[in-house]
Regions:
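Positively charged n-region of N-terminal signal peptides that target proteins for export
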Residues: 1-4
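Aromatic- and Gly/Pro-enriched helix-to-coil junctions and flexible linker segments
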Residues: 14-162
Length: 162
């Protein structure tokens, strides 16, 4: 009986959150990774994400309008550099457009394949190749221009009388 009690006590201590192995802290980003974020990733987030995950609205307590807030995450971690397969952000971005949790939402313009490739490379911890960065940026500029045009059209449209 005493052995069983000792075994049970040892098992409880081993399973306790106080003895559980803590996750490794994220490694600091390199200067090149910060530059990739600033030049390629942040503009993509501005075009596709910040309207719901920015200073005016924080869905899921997640903000993607600065590098620091992006790395901090929201209710869940956004991603860990070098671990793309465990990234909540990537899993949502790469979902089929028919899925319920796809990001950006179905009502918004989705990221292009080049933008997704650039985001994946960044989260993977790899440099974003120049050609991919240029293609992703061109797609981002087109998305921003389309959003600006749509906003101007909506503002100029006559308001319906009640």
């Amino acid at each position: 009986m005493r052995v069983l009690l000792l075994f049970s006590a040892a098992t409880l201590v081993a399973a306790s959150p106080f003895t559980a192995k803590k996750p490794e802290p994220a490694k600091p980003l390199t200067a090149a990774q910060k530059a990739d974020f600033t030049k390629v990733i942040q503009p993509m987030f501005d075009a596709h994400c910040v309207s719901c995950h920015g200073p005016k609205k924080e869905k899921g307590k997640l903000r993607l309008d600065t590098l620091e807030l992006t790395l901090k995450g929201g209710k869940n971690p956004t991603f860990v550099i070098g671990k793309p397969d465990s990234s909540m952000l990537l899993s949502r971005v790469f979902l089929e457009r028919t899925a319920g949790d796809v990001m950006p939402p179905k009502s918004e313009k989705p990221m292009t394949e080049k933008q997704k490739e650039a985001l994946y490379a960044f989260v993977e911890g790899q440099p974003i190749p120049d050609e991919l960065a240029k293609a992703a940026l061109a797609d981002t500029k087109a998305a921003l221009a389309a959003a600006k045009t749509a906003a101007a059209d909506a503002k100029a449209a006559p308001k319906a009388k009640k």
